[in-house]
Amino acid sequence: TAEQLKLFRDIVNGAGGQTQNRGAYAVLTANIDLKNEEWTPIGPDRDSAYTGTFDGQGHTVKNLSVTVNVQPGRAGLFGCVKDGTIRKLTVAGSVSCTANQGWCGGIAGYAMDETIENCASLCTVSCTGIDARVGGIVGLVDYNSRTLIIRDCYNIGKITGRSDNGSGDAGGICGFYMNGKISNCYNVGEITGSGYVSKIAVSAYNDSRPTNCYYLSDTDTDLNGTAKTAAEFANGDVLEELKAGQRDNNADPWADECKYLAAAGKTLPVFN
């Protein structure tokens, strides 16, 4: 229930009279409706980053509403995650930050050495302060992160990164990262930013570019992904590529057929 998820958050954050446990283990057993009530992120800052395993079991947290206006802002269902795993989770709602150094993502604002897999964001995500980093799944990956993995994820929400100093980086999956592995993902959401913009992820180094990732466009203009038309998404071409990109250590999460997603207004690959 929503109340149980709030209790879990308070345990991780050490709030509401709870003894802090940043590594608490959680499993969703049903979809959760947060009813657009203002949500304080799980792991609101790097000192309180969530370090455990969160298994969504294919469920959705919907009507998420996050508004952060305190610098530095870390906004998402999770604010900061580190050295843990988030899997099989879909989030829907809105995430925004107006503070400087705002990092925003549907799943998490900030990540370091984390594994995020089989996750989807249907969120509208925006950051408007100086040095904004905003992504569909994760806003910013720590510069010192070495073992981050984002795989088999997708975004269909609108992503906006706007900053007065021109540094509003925005990516469909990740707003900015230097090290780590992003693979087997797709984005069909609209991406805009005043800094660097990528349909998949803004990356600093060529050797850390995303692999086997796809975005919706009639023109192939993004080096960090491969453009596919709406027809190629709908007819199973992208799904076939995603299934072909599976590794032995990661069970295939993708359904055998595409499905019409009302939130996107398109037929797209979905999870089992």
Predicted regions and their residues:
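Surface-exposed repetitive/solenoidal architectures
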Residues: 1-272
